[in-house]
Amino acid sequence: MQLTSFTDYGLRALIYMASLPSGKMTSISEVTEVYGVSRNHMVKIINQLSRAGLVMAVRGKNGGIRLGKPAETIRIGDVVRELEPLTLVNCSHEFCHITAACRLKQVLQQAVQNFLHELDQYTLADMVKENPPLYKLLLVE
C-alpha cells in the first residue's frame, strides 16, 4: 500500500509544525519552500487538516498556521484516516460481478485496520521529539 502524495505532504506539514517551538506560527509558503511542494496543493492539504482540527489557521498580518492541538495527541493513524482514501479495491456490483460471493474485500479491510492500528501506536510528537537531525534538515532549532 502506498500513501497518496496528499497524505504524504500532509504528514510532512504536520511534522514541520510539530518541530517548531510550541505555539509558533509558520506559513503555508514556508512549508512549501521546505518541502518543494506546489502552494496550491499545500493549501488544499492545510484546509483539510484545518477542517479536521489538526491545524489552526489564523488570518491577517500576524497570522499563519500551527498545530490545532498538542502533537502528543495527534495519532499518525488518525491523520492517515483523515487524508487517505482507504478503499483498496472497488467492490461495487457494476464493477465486479463476484462481489456477492467475494471474501477478498474482508481480508483487505482487515489488512487496512491492522495497518491503521499500527499507525495509532505513534503520535506526531514521537516523530519529532529529540530528533536533532530532523531539526537540522528542516532548519528549525
UniProtKB/Swiss-Prot annotation:
Cofactors: [2Fe-2S] cluster
Binding site for [2Fe-2S] cluster: C91, C96, C102
InterPro entries xrefs: TR_Rrf2-type_CS (IPR030489), Tscrpt_reg_Rrf2 (IPR000944), Tscrpt_rep_HTH_NsrR (IPR023761), WH-like_DNA-bd_sf (IPR036388), WH_DNA-bd_sf (IPR036390)
Cofactor binding, note field: Binds 1 [2Fe-2S] cluster per subunit.
A Pfam family that the UniProt record links to this protein: Rrf2
Keyword annotations from UniProtKB, A to Z: 2Fe-2S, DNA-binding, Iron, Iron-sulfur, Metal-binding, Repressor, Transcription, Transcription regulation
Name of this chain's protein: HTH-type transcriptional repressor NsrR
Organism the protein comes from: Pectobacterium atrosepticum (strain SCRI 1043 / ATCC BAA-672) (Erwinia carotovora subsp. atroseptica)
